[in-house]
């Protein structure tokens, strides 16, 4: 072996096989488009689960779909469905500040409303080592879980600060970010600006 040559370790990325009943949406899928219009979410890249009437949010890693989360459009339970469970979180946006929220819609809408933020939906799970790997890639962290989870918000702030050493702030909101409440969006924006 030549001197200086290094072995290359390639990360194997699991790829999700998309079920046949998860399709590209068409204009005739009124429940799908009504859902997107209600939340003011763009349809780009989203799919539709015709079997269970779900809006499907794919999760990508290095250009490959590794998981997807489906949101029930007609009251089918569970409301949120994980297709593989391989992805620890859903990300939206591309800022250096990480905003941790609970669900996909809150992540998408926060990224739309707040510049220079990446939103991470933890998808109803507890924080784990995989989450911390992702969190460690950012310059600071804001935790803004649903209002009924204030204790969990404070707990996550402590865990993240201890685990990563990053500046981490807990934010108490009046409602989920997905509802676009002006006070909540302004609170998050102010915390982004003043925590630099």
Regions found by a protein language model. Give the residues of each.
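Phosphate-handling DNA/RNA-contact segment within nucleic-acid enzymes
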Residues: 36, 49-138
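TOPRIM fold recognition
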Residues: 95-98, 106-196
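Residue-identity detector for glutamine
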Residues: 6, 20, 24, 86, ...
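Alpha-helix initiation and N-capping motif
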Residues: 29-32, 65, 182-185
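TOPRIM metal-binding catalytic domain and adjacent DNA-binding surface shared by DnaG-type primases
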Residues: 1-62, 92-93, 193-196
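N-terminal cationic leader/targeting segments used for protein routing and processing
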Residues: 3-6, 80, 184, 190
């Amino acid at each position: 072996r030549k001197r200086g040559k290094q072995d290359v370790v390639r990360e194997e990325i699991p790829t999700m096989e998309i079920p046949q009943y998860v399709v590209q949406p068409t204009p005739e899928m009124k429940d799908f488009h009504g859902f997107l219009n209600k939340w003011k979410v763009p349809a780009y890249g989203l799919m539709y689960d015709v079997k269970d009437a779900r809006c499907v949010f794919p999760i990508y890693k290095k250009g490959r779909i590794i998981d997807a989360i489906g949101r029930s459009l007609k009251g089918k339970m569970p409301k949120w469905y994980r297709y593989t469970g391989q992805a620890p979180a859903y990300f939206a946006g591309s800022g250096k500040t990480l905003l941790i929220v609970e669900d996909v819609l809150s992540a998408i809408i926060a990224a739309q409303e707040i510049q220079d933020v990446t939103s991470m939906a933890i998808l109803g799970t507890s924080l784990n080592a995989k989450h911390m790997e992702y969190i460690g890639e950012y310059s600071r962290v804001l935790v803004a879980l649903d209002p009924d989870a204030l204790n969990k918000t404070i707990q996550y702030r402590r865990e993240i600060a201890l685990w990563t050493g990053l500046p981490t702030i807990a934010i108490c909101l009046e409602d989920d970010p997905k509802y676009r409440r002006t006070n909540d969006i302004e609170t998050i924006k102010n915390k982004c600006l003043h925590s630099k």
